[in-house]
């Protein structure tokens, strides 16, 4: 798994985790949009990184919205992952052309602690700015999940994971 250049525009994953830690004490957080690029043949790596964050967000009174392209979340997986089944909503078979628009609308409402959407193509500057504004307005987090195949991964970048944090620099 590696993150794209867009992921570093608003924040890194480690700062997202620190924001979540503050949610428990302050009960407020600013909006965040982050892209997660992962290998399709290694979904466990993504789960290891995101599940603790999603479990923490599940303690809020707000919903978690999953905008999935084809697959449907299984109840068994949601429960086994420690996510609150009663707070997870899913819209599946959403056309990619509607994913960004749906994410913006959902983030803006403030009804969701996190909105997760799958996109195959890079965001435009305008789409990214619109998502950031919506996340800030709704005080929510948005994750753009971008799967890549193992063959395209080998041609794009050799390192598997890059997490930039000002804590280590």
Swiss-Prot record:
- List site positions: Essential for degradation by Lon protease: 169
Please tell me, according to the UniProt entry, what happens when changing residue 169 to A. Answer: Great decrease in degradation by Lon protease
**Segment FtsZ binding: which positions?**
106-112
- Gene Ontology BP terms: division septum assembly; DNA damage response; DNA repair; negative regulation of cell division; negative regulation of cytokinesis; negative regulation of FtsZ-dependent cytokinesis; negative regulation of protein polymerization; SOS response
**What induces it, per record?**
By DNA damage, as part of the SOS response, repressed by LexA. Induced 8-fold by hydroxyurea (at protein level).
Q: Does this entry carry the keyword DNA repair?
A: no
Per its UniProt record, what InterPro entries does this chain match? Cell_div_suppressor_SulA, P-loop_NTPase, SulA_CellDiv_inhibitor, SulA_enterobact
Q: What is the effect of changing residue 62 to A?
A: Loss of degradation by Lon protease
Region (Lon protease binding), start-end ranges: 162-169
Q: Does the keyword Cell cycle apply?
A: yes
Modification after translation, per record: Is rapidly cleaved and degraded by the Lon protease once DNA damage is repaired.
Q: What result is annotated for mutating residue 105 to A?
A: No effect on degradation by Lon protease
Give the record's keywords alphabetically. Cell cycle, Cell division, DNA damage, Septation, SOS response
- Which NCBIfam families does the UniProt record give? PRK10595.1 (NF007892), SOS_SulA_coli (TIGR00623)
PANTHER family reported in the protein's UniProt record: BLR3025 PROTEIN-RELATED (PTHR35369), CELL DIVISION INHIBITOR SULA (PTHR35369:SF4)
Q: Which family does it belong to?
A: Belongs to the SulA family.
Assembly behavior: Interacts with FtsZ.
Q: What does this protein do?
A: Component of the SOS system and an inhibitor of cell division. Accumulation of SulA causes rapid cessation of cell division and the appearance of long, non-septate filaments. In the presence of GTP, binds a polymerization-competent form of FtsZ in a 1:1 ratio, thus inhibiting FtsZ polymerization and therefore preventing it from participating in the assembly of the Z ring. This mechanism prevents the premature segregation of damaged DNA to daughter cells during cell division. The effect of overexpression of SulA is neutralized by antitoxin CbeA (yeeU).
Name of protein: Cell division inhibitor SulA
- Record organism: Escherichia coli (strain K12)
